[in-house]
Amino acid sequence: MMILMLSYSNMINWENIFANSNTFKNNKPFPYGFIENFFHEDFYNELYNTYPKIDESWYVPTDSTRYAKKKWFGTANPNSDQKSVDQEDPSFSRTWNQFFHYMHSKEFLDNMSKYSDIVLTGFNHFSFIVNEKGSFNMPHTHHPTEQKKDYSYNLTLLVYF
């Protein structure tokens, strides 16, 4: 497997993200934020223009809490507890692979930790989700039996296109 070494400086608009950090940290009843222009515009446009097309590789979860088409990156298995692994996925564009690699980098995790004030060491899952007419996601928790100190979903990042 070949993982390209890339320059990540033109992907994420960290200045804008950090400018919204205090809002995230102080929102009630829990920390949350909404950041416009998360990506630099050129990089966003590349991601948008190469967003994966819906085909037979997408699936629909069968539980009653959601109905939306999903596609996982690489060899991820939606039915396992395996953490996300940095890898190339030739079914996605070079730009999506670059972003996926960057999300696994120390720089990305350190910056998201700085933004959120939550120490992050990795992430669990990465998926594409398409909500069409009739799609839904019910309010839910991913691991309702875990104690807060053990909770594996410390930060959820949703990027909309």
PLM region descriptions:
Residues L6, I12-E15, N22-N111:
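Non-heme Fe(II)/2-oxoglutarate
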Residues N20-N22, V130:
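Short hydrophobic "helix-edge" motifs at membrane interfaces and signal-peptide entry regions
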Residues E88-F161:
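Catalytic core of non-heme Fe(II) oxygenases with the double-stranded beta-helix
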